């Protein structure tokens, strides 16, 4: 028994030296939007780097929670697109606010509840004003505040692959874009 205990101790103490080294994630592709060093805070108050979205394809857009016209249509179009694509499990839905002054964690949580967003797939997020501007520029979303607190803004849905490359873009809001849905199906079908 002494020999077995000594043998077991030597294996336990030297085993880590022979273990396979942990592999670092592959570098991001040069055209990945995750190259941007921004931080997002979600509707549950969790803060993470923008690049933490890596690993799962995403439909991404920008909005603001107090919008009563176009932004609900953006959210509904994202929902409808996911449904039309067969509700793939390997697909995240991310809407980032460009009104960080008002769209805090509580406002985003209330918005998610009011719009019945399934938080298994959905993330509503806000960032610092500087990160919001950088993210909007990167995604090609234009916005400007109006004196009454509303915003003029463009409306776009982007499909990102797991590494953050833009695979498809759609400006069709209020109904599904067949080409965009096809791109979602193709990308989500390619995932393990």
Residue ranges and their predicted role:
Residues 73-135:
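Structural microenvironment flanking redox-active thiols in thiol-disulfide oxidoreductases
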């Amino acid at each position: 028994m002494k020999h077995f205990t000594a043998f077991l101790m030597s294996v336990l103490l030297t085993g880590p030296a022979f273990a396979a080294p942990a592999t670092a994630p592959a570098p991001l592709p040069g055209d990945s939007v995750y190259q941007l060093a921004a931080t997002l805070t979600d509707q549950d108050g969790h803060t993470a780097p923008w690049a933490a979205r890596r690993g799962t394809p995403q439909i991404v857009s920008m909005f603001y929670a107090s919008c009563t016209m176009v932004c609900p249509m953006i959210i509904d179009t994202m929902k409808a697109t996911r449904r039309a694509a067969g509700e793939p499990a390997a697909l995240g839905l991310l809407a980032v606010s460009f009104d960080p002054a008002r769209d805090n964690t509580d406002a985003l949580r209330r918005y998610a509840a009011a719009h019945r967003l399934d938080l298994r797939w959905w993330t509503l997020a806000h960032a610092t004003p500087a990160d919001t501007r950088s993210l909007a520029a990167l995604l090609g979303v234009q916005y400007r505040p109006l004196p009454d607190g509303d915003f003029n803004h463009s409306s776009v849905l982007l499909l990102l692959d797991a590494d953050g490359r833009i695979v498809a873009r759609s400006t069709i809001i209020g109904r599904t874009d067949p080409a965009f849905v096809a791109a979602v199906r193709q990308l989500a079908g390619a995932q393990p």
